[in-house]
Amino acid sequence: MILELDCGNSFIKWRVIHAADAVIEGGGIVDSDQALLAAVAALASVRLTGCRIVSVRSEEETDALCALIAQAFAVQARVAHPAQSMAGVRNGYDDYQRLGMDRWLAALGAFHLAGGACLVIDLGTAAKADFVAADGEHLGGYICPGMPLMRSQLRTHTRRIRYDDASAERALTSLSPGRSTVEAVERGCVLMLQGFARTQLEQARALWGEAFTVFLTGGDAPLVREAVPQARVVPDLVFVGLAMACPLD
């Protein structure tokens, strides 16, 4: 079985799949390396034969995690690295090594699934969009604060904004004008995300008309689903690209 890891800015998304058919044995999201080791070890009858990682962490942090995995499960992790081109997609950055690996792998996965032009909208700690033309040319993209960053900045820099996660969840039962601070903040942030998504859709239509596929991924993808109803929601899109970048027997 293969352990796949997406090490983001705030959390580690993980899953264990069967090597032969990619059937998912287990998975989840954790907030530390130790929590990851415990979660994987808790899977009954799982014997890992390989591990592949995409990480936006520092090289030192990623190496430390690889060492922990080797010690705990006796497998050597393969880490995805930037490339100028791969699987029919050409990296569109002037300095290809500066394109975030999560964005690069999501673009690979989306182009593979779409078989043509595609727009990837990834909503996590940051909100990201990337455009890939029908010939595989990555045209670039956009990055702005995602829901967690917007919320955090308002809480940090505005003294009277204080509320808990349960209140935040209740506030999103609708998007009508907020009648409390928590409703105003949460709904305002969602509307900003939806506006971001709609703008990307307009850009894609200006480029390709209707001849493209939209992909939504990331933990906050459900918040913009109604803004882009034609989108394909693929929570594990980065893992699709990771399997292409780091094939394992």
UniProtKB/Swiss-Prot annotation:
One of its GO terms (biological process) is coenzyme A biosynthetic process. K(+) binds at D122. Substrate binds at Y93, G100, M101, D102, R103, T181. Its main location: cytoplasm. The active site is at D102 (proton acceptor). It is an enzyme of class 2 (transferase). Keywords: ATP-binding, Coenzyme A biosynthesis, Cytoplasm, Kinase, Metal-binding, Nucleotide-binding, Potassium, Transferase. It comes from the Bacteria. One of its GO terms (molecular function) is pantothenate kinase activity. One of its GO terms (cellular component) is cytoplasm. Pathway: Cofactor biosynthesis; coenzyme A biosynthesis; CoA from (R)-pantothenate: step 1/5. A monovalent cation. Ammonium or potassium. It catalyses: (R)-pantothenate + ATP = (R)-4'-phosphopantothenate + ADP + H(+). ATP binds at D6, C7, G8, N9, S10, F11, I12, K13, T125. Pfam families: Pan_kinase. Transmembrane segments: none annotated. It is found in: Cytoplasm. CDD domains: ASKHA_NBD_PanK-III. Its EC number is 2.7.1.33. Its cofactor is NH4(+); K(+). Homodimer. Belongs to the type III pantothenate kinase family. Catalyzes the phosphorylation of pantothenate (Pan), the first step in CoA biosynthesis. PANTHER family: TYPE III PANTOTHENATE KINASE. This is Type III pantothenate kinase. It comes from Pseudomonas putida (strain GB-1). The gene is coaX.
